[in-house]
């Protein structure tokens, strides 16, 4: 009987260790649609991280440009990611994203610490992160599709 308990105990330890390792994976919480977003799911891609707020008029006019950029980046190992400056969560985040007609992923948790992004008090602000996770550019103010495409192309050296 003692041998059987040891086997069960070892199995429990292995399961607990696996659960702990899984729980340690960095998580950005659910996006505006309730889908979990992990840091691992974003690794190895170029990221265009845009901070926006409902009270920011230039943010509102910039969103269609970012929606268009997200569409052009499909199948290119690059994504547009939004972050609400006011840290809205859950239904509030969904309502705000819907009111702006945001079609790209909006994170519930700020990725600033993971990517070492400086806090900006001016909006909109957009960061371009390379596929190694390094900040390559900080862009202040309203961006255009053409401007972002040109900047990404130049940074990639294409």
Predicted features along the sequence, with ranges:
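Bacterial N-terminal signal peptides that target proteins for export
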Residues: 2-13
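C-terminal motif of bacterial Sec signal peptides marking the signal peptidase cleavage site
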Residues: 22-23
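Alpha/beta-hydrolase fold active-site loops
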Residues: 46-47, 78, 124
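Structural microenvironment flanking redox-active thiols in thiol-disulfide oxidoreductases
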Residues: 61-100, 110-115
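Thiol/disulfide oxidoreductase modules built on the thioredoxin-like
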Residues: 98-102, 108-153
């Amino acid at each position: 009987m003692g041998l059987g308990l040891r086997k069960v105990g070892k199995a429990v330890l292995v399961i607990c260790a696996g659960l702990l390792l899984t729980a340690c994976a960095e998580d950005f919480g659910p996006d505006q649609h309730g889908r979990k977003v992990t840091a691992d799911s974003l690794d190895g891609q170029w990221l265009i991280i845009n901070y926006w707020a409902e009270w920011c008029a230039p943010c509102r006019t910039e969103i269609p440009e970012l929606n268009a950029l997200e569409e052009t980046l499909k199948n290119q190992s690059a994504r547009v990611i939004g972050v609400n400056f006011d840290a809205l969560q859950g239904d509030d985040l969904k309502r705000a994203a819907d009111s702006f007609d945001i079609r790209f992923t909006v994170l519930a948790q700020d990725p600033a610490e993971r990517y070492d992004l400086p806090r900006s008090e001016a909006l909109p602000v957009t960061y371009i992160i390379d596929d190694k996770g390094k900040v390559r550019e900080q862009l202040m103010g309203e961006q255009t599709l053409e401007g972002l495409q040109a900047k990404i192309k130049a940074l990639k050296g294409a």
